[in-house]
């Protein structure tokens, strides 16, 4: 079975999916298994979404982090990466040319000129054993 879920809540998506596709301004910017994405996020927008997932270890009424700036104007296609104006890692190249959406390692695709550093990152508590594969659920 396949389910298409559209959400800004990657924590919720992780509880239902084996694989996550992250989109920004109508374009796919990162795609990987839940475990790979949460453990080794590469796209700054994906990282921002993960940072906004509510967590039980935060004090009550703590505001969630927000992505600075405004969403892009979808009526005018950007020459470069549409996330560049809001991205903390952006450089001139990002505004000038759109990065290719490529598979940078088996099963992990992303489109970013200046991705977050590669390397293991702890999977968020409570997400290590979620999703249909972990629970034996049907696809």
Where are each of the predicted segments found?
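Charged, flexible cofactor/metal-binding loops and thiol motifs
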Residues: 33-134
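H-loop/switch region of ABC-family ATPase nucleotide-binding domains
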Residues: 7-8
